[in-house]
């Protein structure tokens, strides 16, 4: 099943890649210069940079990430994102993002295509 692209903040969209009983993966595409404000969630998260460059700000400290880099975020750790270049990310969450799966189900057409 092809899941829809869903904008999560200006210049940042995500699409469910795959999920199971205990894990969830999404692809996120971030336009150059886009920002995701500080937030936290009860899920553990691994951010893997497929392409591009971004800053991941964790507890006020910026971590420069580029193609091939990965970063682990524990549960409830505040973090924010600032992109330097257009960036494509594979995010893995545990437990699954039930909120994102519900949003996938309620997304209305048209569905953005690659």
Where are these regions (language model features)?
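Short, surface-exposed secondary-structure edge patches
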Residues: 37, 46, 61-63
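A short, N-terminal "cap"/entry segment at the start of jelly-roll beta-barrel domains
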Residues: 1-23, 102-114
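Short acidic-glycine-tyrosine-enriched beta hairpin
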Residues: 60-75
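Ligand-binding loop in jelly-roll beta-barrel domains
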Residues: 75-99
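Histidine-centered metal-chelating micro-motifs
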Residues: 35-37, 71, 75-80
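A cytosolic small-molecule/anion-sensing beta-strand core signal
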Residues: 50-51, 66-67, 85
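Conserved short histidine dyad/triad with adjacent acidic residue
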Residues: 9, 26-40
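Glycine- and acidic-residue-biased ligand/ion/polar-headgroup-sensing regions
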Residues: 43-54, 59
